[in-house]
Amino acid sequence: MDRYAVIGQPVAHSKSPYIHNEYARQTAQAMRYEAIEVGVDALVPTLKRLHDEGYLGVNITLPHKVAVAALCETISERAALAGAVNTLIRTDTGWRGDNTDGEGLVRDITQNLHLTIAGKRVLVLGAGGAARGLLKPLLDEKPASLTLTNRNPWKPEELAAQFKAHGAIQPCTHLAIKGDQFDLIIHATSAGHSGSMPRIADHILAPGAICYDLSYGKAFEIFAAWARAQGATRIADGLGMLVEQAAAAFRIWRGVEPDTAAVIAALHKTVSNVEAAETSVHDSNAKKRTAAEHTAAAHSIAAED
């Protein structure tokens, strides 16, 4: 049976094993996909071990995407531009690196959300590693404009210069977006994981605009709340991108097309159930705390009496 894996730290939470094993079931592929916890110090020997043991492909997640790019025999143009690798393909003597993140985003937007990016005004919030992997695939779709924002101006300016041969990028800070409207807003910062949101101007959504967050679950809710407050009716999380970037890797490895829609639906249901369970637990704990506080208060009053 052919073997594949995702490596990172932490990696126990990864949905990649479910996604790829489901793809294998759908397409009758004789393969097994697993998650392997790998720290920074173990990265090089682990990649050698996986190659020696005959693994045919490996997905890379945090914190190794940048480091792995330098360890590959060759890398694709899009991986080189992204400065990061999320997919390894076995060669006779090592690994070839690729990056399917941007392809996953574009396929989710165009095929699952049915938005044509060509001719649209696109805004990408954030100019870090996550955004960098999206820029060439977005530019390849020929948007009317692509604006890249960040807290500090130098990062968008640097990326605009780097990607100049592939298309025009308008760099600016978050606060400099005023008076413009966009058809597609992509949130590519990690702010949602800390319960915050980049400071950007109001009234920047064009009619029918899609607001898209690379995050999902609780980290998605901050951006979603902002989008709803701006009147957005089309808001999407990053689960579709996660599933589609995995499908892109699966096609490279196996040469077959999986059914991504079924997996996206299943994952959305799973995430919703987990969040509902967590909310129930939190509510239960809150009630217990409230009851304990009331009991303590009653004891305090009784003692004072």
Question: Where would I find each of the regions flagged by the language model?
Answer:
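Phosphate-coordination loops involved in phosphoryl transfer and adenosine-cofactor binding
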Residues: 1, 118-121, 207-208
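Glycine-rich adenosine-cofactor-binding loop
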Residues: 8, 99-102, 109, 113, ...
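Conserved S-adenosyl-L-methionine
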Residues: 140-145, 230-233
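NAD(P)-binding Rossmann-fold cofactor-contacting core
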Residues: 143-163
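Rossmann-like adenosine-cofactor binding region
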Residues: 166-235
